From Swiss-Prot:
Belongs to the bacterial ribosomal protein bL35 family. It comes from the Bacteria. Residues 1-20 are annotated as: Disordered. GO terms for molecular function: structural constituent of ribosome. One of its GO terms (cellular component) is cytosolic large ribosomal subunit. PANTHER family: 54S RIBOSOMAL PROTEIN BL35M, LARGE RIBOSOMAL SUBUNIT PROTEIN BL35M. It comes from Anaeromyxobacter dehalogenans (strain 2CP-C). HAMAP family: Ribosomal_bL35. InterPro entries: Ribosomal_bL35, Ribosomal_bL35-like, Ribosomal_bL35_CS, Ribosomal_bL35_sf. This is Large ribosomal subunit protein bL35.
Length: 67
């Protein structure tokens, strides 16, 4: 039986962790951030976050070998 493939779009955007949570980086900080957003908006977009439990289930299906 062939190996199952990971969804390429998911592996570029999400990182499944050993704890079972899925880490991601927030959208909206690539460009056009100098004049379109306030300092508060940019501050909240910084860093990474974990997915909500309902979204987590859908994304975990894209990673067949994640624990």
């Amino acid at each position: 039986m062939p190996k199952l493939k990971t969804k390429s779009g998911a592996k570029k955007r999400f990182v499944p962790k050993k704890s079972g949570k899925v880490k991601f980086r927030r959208a909206g900080v690539r460009h056009l951030a100098t004049f379109g957003k306030t300092k508060k908006q940019k501050r909240h977009l910084r860093g990474t976050d974990h997915l909500a439990p309902m979204d987590e289930k859908k994304i975990k299906e894209c990673f067949p070998y994640a624990r």
